[in-house]
C-alpha cells in the first residue's frame, strides 16, 4: 500500500491491487470564507485524480467536503462510491446529493465493508463532533485515518 499526502486531510491511498482511495478532498482554492488556504498549493492537475475508485469523507466541514475542489475534479468522479459516516444527519446526505454525488456508502459506527478483494474498511464515529475515522485493512497492512476528532 502506498499513501501520498496531498494536503490538509487529503490523502491518496493506493492499494497493492492499484485501487485508489481519496480522502477528504480539499484540493483547490480557499475554505471557510477565504480564511483557510492550502499551502503549498497542490502540484497536481485535476486529471491526476481521474482514476479514483473511492472517496472517503470524514465529516461535513468545508475543509473536508470542499465544494470548489469537488467541482474542480473530473465530472465522472461524482459517480464513484463515497464512503461516509452515518451520523443519522440528513444534512450530510443532502449535501452530497447537492454536490452531485449519487453513490453513497453510509457506514455506522464500527461497521465494516469489503470494498475489493481483501480490502476492508471499518468506520469509527465520534457522534459528539459529527466526525469519523477510518481503518483500512488488507492482508498485511492496517492504516488508521483520523482527522479532527
PLM regions: where:
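Extreme N-terminal starter segment of soluble prokaryotic enzymes
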Residues: 1-4, 20
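Pre-active-site segment of Zn-dependent metallo-hydrolases
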Residues: 18-56, 60, 68-72
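Active-site environment of divalent metal-dependent phosphoester hydrolases
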Residues: 9, 29-30, 61-65, 89-92, ...
